[in-house]
Amino acid sequence: MAFLFISNEWKYQQLIFKINCWHFCYYPKNYLGGSILSKRLFIPPSACRIDLSVFPWAFICSPWNFCSTWSSLICSPCFSTVWVSLLICSPWRSTTWTNWLICSPCFSTVWVNLLICSPWAAKVVSIFVSRWLFEFLYSLNSLRVTYSVFTGITGLLSLNCLLNLPENSTLLFSGLMMYQPEKVPFLVFFTMSWNSFSL
């Protein structure tokens, strides 16, 4: 069934986007204790401990859509200041530390444009995030295969677009998730490291 989703990547991405947005953003309080949707998708309650209501909804609602939002939405010169000011620096988020460090006009432009929007930084960050993600999925023991098929393939499809990985890498990693999940963390980290340092 997983390869059927891969054959139609766009519709699969839109489906996961709607599920994540409905699950994480519209019901953030239910996410704390593991909602009904998470139990149906075999997501363990231990993964539902972060209160996502304190984070910007526009960024959380697209956790796997880096290909569409990374360049056009977050990394645009005009939107960078608006994103930091309106979402991160909103009144329900504002504190002394946030206003002084993140919400300053100078820091917002430098941090968003130079750090997040640089291709090298994006790839380096994605390497550590992906390595932590797949190590976490592997540590789920009995639930690792089901949870990996649901979240891992979605992340691989987006990382495949973000890091310009070969098309066969998505099929390779997806197959390893279902048949040999213990080999996934090493191969993913090796492939992304090789692609990152070959800029």
UniProtKB/Swiss-Prot annotation:
Keywords: Cell membrane, Membrane, Transmembrane, Transmembrane helix. It is found in: Cell membrane. The chain crosses the membrane at residues 41-61, 72-92, 109-129, 145-165. It is a multi-pass membrane protein. One of its GO terms (cellular component) is plasma membrane. To M.pneumoniae MPN_037. This is Uncharacterized protein MPN_465. The lineage of its organism: Bacteria, Bacillati, Mycoplasmatota, Mycoplasmoidales, Mycoplasmoidaceae.
